[in-house]
Amino acid sequence: MSDTNEILELYYLAQKYKLEGREILDKYSFEDLAKIFNGIGPDAFPSWLRCVISKLHPSLAPVALIHDCEWHESDRTYDSFTESNERFKRNGAIVAKGMYSFFNPRRYIVKNQAYRFGCYCEHLGWHAWCTPCECPICKEARAKEKHG
């Protein structure tokens, strides 16, 4: 879980770079976004590993925030699964272009990493897309349903 200051910064960056799908962020409060956002990496990874990956790839954090919200709202269809992963790749390229100049090698590193992460999600994430969300909001809702 992230703090609201980090989420505010990521929200700002998503707006600044006009990332695809950024409208999904407006559905939630910053507190809820902080509960939904788990950093870069799947829920199955331990939090320390997601933290390390996120620290190594900070420019992809606003892309991952949108992606996490899409996965939070998963409709469990293959079309939306594919679109979410393709959007991650496109948004990563947008961020890379916006943050780094043409001659800066980091531009191409970030773009490549976004593409790779999107491919990992495509090839390894279908099961997670089809299972219930594990964010604190969804866990609380399931607990309330269970206990009436």
Where in this protein do the model-derived segments appear?
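Extended terminal accessory/targeting regions
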Residues: M1-G148
